[in-house]
């Protein structure tokens, strides 16, 4: 688990050793995202391929373009499964094992890998942590480049992320954020479901939910507090009581986030 796993070239093209020999097989032992909507026109599909290939040296485009075109056809997205790391376990490792120049960067690397841990993530190989579309990155190239930047970053630099795309390391100072993240920066007039599907398929926008694209997913515990307050206020408003003692609370919410409902109900006194 060394720095070579995250090394990138200064041109921002991925080191060929990262992907040339990697597996192309889809792992059947984990859940996978459903096929996304086929919404792109033919010119837009060409643009999606161009956007995906920007991460690679031009010499490799002829090899990768057909493969990425097949992913776009089969899955509705270009995930770059070839680049999924298989030489180390995807999980939150002890912070001192990360090849980083500052501890904050190591912590962020740890958080990213926790979000992509198969035990944690909903569709880990499609980089979806929760909610069906809560993405950490849009593709595995972005993962490698971001981890490479984090391994190089000092406490006088800030990494800027735009919907999974690493814009680069910028000079800052120790009191500045180590990472500035935006996801789904779209104005309301262009934010329909089809707009999202199109822009995500093009590789120019992603939906990071609240804690997937910000690298800090902690499951239902992250919303237990707010859910408890909501349940208590519902009791006050509709039942004219201060808690749910003696009330049977029925919910189908038992998933990664909605599981907070059962916990909140118990905290509020329900049975």
Description of each model-found segment:
Residues 213-271:
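Glycine-rich phosphate/ribose-binding loops and adjacent secondary-structure elements
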Residues 1-226, 236-242:
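N-terminal ligand-binding/catalytic initiation module
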């Amino acid at each position: 688990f060394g720095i070579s796993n995250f090394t990138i070239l200064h041109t921002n093209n991925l080191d060929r050793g990262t992907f040339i020999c990697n597996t192309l097989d889809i792992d059947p032992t984990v859940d996978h995202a459903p096929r996304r909507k086929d919404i792109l026109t033919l010119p837009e599909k060409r643009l999606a391929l161009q956007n995906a290939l920007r991460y690679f040296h031009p010499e490799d485009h002829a090899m990768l373009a057909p493969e990425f075109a097949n992913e776009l056809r089969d899955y509705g997205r270009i995930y770059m499964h070839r680049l999924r790391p298989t030489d180390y376990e995807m999980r939150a490792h002890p912070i001192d094992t990360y090849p980083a120049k500052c501890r904050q960067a190591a912590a962020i690397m740890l958080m990213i890998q926790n979000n992509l841990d198969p035990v944690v993530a909903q569709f880990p190989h499609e980089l979806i942590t929760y909610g069906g579309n809560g993405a950490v990155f849009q593709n595995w190239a972005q993962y490698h480049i971001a981890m490479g930047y984090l391994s190089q970053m000092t406490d006088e630099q800030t990494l800027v992320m735009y919907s999974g795309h690493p814009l680069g390391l910028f000079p800052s100072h120790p009191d500045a954020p180590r990472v500035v993240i935006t996801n789904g920066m779209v104005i309301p007039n262009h934010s329909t479901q089809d707009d999202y599907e199109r822009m995500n398929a093009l590789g120019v926008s992603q939906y990071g939910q609240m804690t997937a694209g910000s690298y800090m997913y902690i499951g239902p515990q992250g919303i237990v507090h707010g859910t408890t307050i909501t349940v208590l206020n519902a009791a006050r408003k509709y039942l004219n009581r201060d808690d749910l003692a003696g009330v049977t609370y029925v919910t189908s919410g038992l998933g990664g986030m909605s599981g907070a409902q059962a916990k909140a109900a118990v905290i509020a006194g329900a049975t």
